[in-house]
Design a protein with these regions (language model features):
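Short, charged recognition helix plus adjacent turn
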Residues: 71-102
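DNA-binding alpha-helical recognition surfaces that contact promoter or target DNA
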Residues: 43, 57, 72
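The alpha-helix within a helix-turn-helix
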Residues: 20, 31, 60
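A short, Lys/Arg-rich alpha-helix, primarily the initiator
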Residues: 1-25, 72
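Short, basic-rich loop-to-helix N-cap that marks the start of a DNA-contacting helix
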Residues: 48-61
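Short alpha-helical DNA-recognition segment
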Residues: 24-43
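Residues within the helices of the helix-turn-helix
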Residues: 17, 28, 57
Length: 102
């Protein structure tokens, strides 16, 4: 279980600060390169859209890295948000481990 209190960098922060800004890319230019509407890129940049497998494959193709990179960024954020949500943790704690005989 994650124990850090600091929220990990989200997809939007990494996308903008580590990829778009150094390359001088606008949201419109990235949207064109990705073949998606600008709204899609805007939502990614503002952490209002989660990275799915197809989006991870597209980002990896555009930036020359791996889809796992993008999915792992999303996974870290999802896990952090879940473990820091009292309602989600209460729901998880209601789950009962199975007693499976060996």
């Amino acid at each position: 279980m994650l124990t850090t209190k600091r929220k990990p960098a989200g997809v939007g922060e990494i996308l903008v600060e580590e990829f778009m800004q150094p390359l001088g890319l606008t949201q419109a230019a990235l949207a064109e390169a990705m073949g998606v509407p600008r709204k899609h890129v805007n939502e990614l940049c503002n952490d209002r859209r989660a990275v799915t497998a197809p989006t991870a494959l597209i980002l990896a193709r555009v930036f020359g890295n791996s889809p796992d990179f993008w999915l792992n960024v999303q996974r870290r954020t999802d896990l952090w948000e879940t473990t820091h949500s009292p309602s989600e943790m209460a729901r998880i704690e209601r789950a009962k481990p199975l007693n499976v005989a060996s």
